[in-house]
Amino acid sequence: MNMKTIYIFGTGESINNITDEQWDFLRTQETIGFSWFFKKNFETNYYYSHEGDEQPWGAAKTICENKWNTEFFLGNTCQEPIKVHNEYKDKIKCRISNTSDWVQTFKGMVWYADSPEPPLSFDEVWAKTHQDKLFGFRGQLMAAINLATVLGADKVVLLGIDLNNGQHFYDIGNHNPSTFEKKLIQASDYEPLKHTHSSNITFNNVRPVTDGLKWVSNFVNIVSGNPDSLLVKQGIVKYEEVKTHKININ
């Protein structure tokens, strides 16, 4: 039986360590981008974002302007609807939770693990969500993994999920920025994006993330493509090198 693998891209600096040959291989695989990964000029099959104005708007803008065939998922933990710039509302394949009626509804529940009283236990949430909903645990990573399982993944490979208080991939090195980021660098005409997110990734408490991954690992095989990821060093997940199309001959 063929096992389905989905690759999930975050924004850690290890994204810059992926080789051209590995990117070529990844273009043939099923992929999910989330958070600010859209700043990388790489088309994923699916994209997940939640909350705020700048992040989902920037992702939608990038998907549309590059004519990517990407299905866009939005999750909402706020009372107010997520705002995606009107220019792009009707141009992307999009599912959105708890918001407007111009797209399909993809219902879900998201909360942060450091809240005093999570509304449900992990067991209850998984039973309610893993077939047809999304949930998050301490941010977007768990929602992206949950999305992968909804899409039928037996195995998830994490790329750019470093959790080592390093930099974002787009703050260092040459990463071939997207059209959106090039415009952002030139001072976007969309005022809130002029000085948007660009700083070191800091995790004051990674335990909710590691605890969540330990639990979800009971249901899906999770590995990391970065040997220096905190998740690998703490033994939460195993390291697995990203393949290429080249045949290695010893």
State what each model feature region is.
Residues 1-250:
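Metal-ion/cofactor- or nucleotide/acyl-coenzyme-handling active-site neighborhoods
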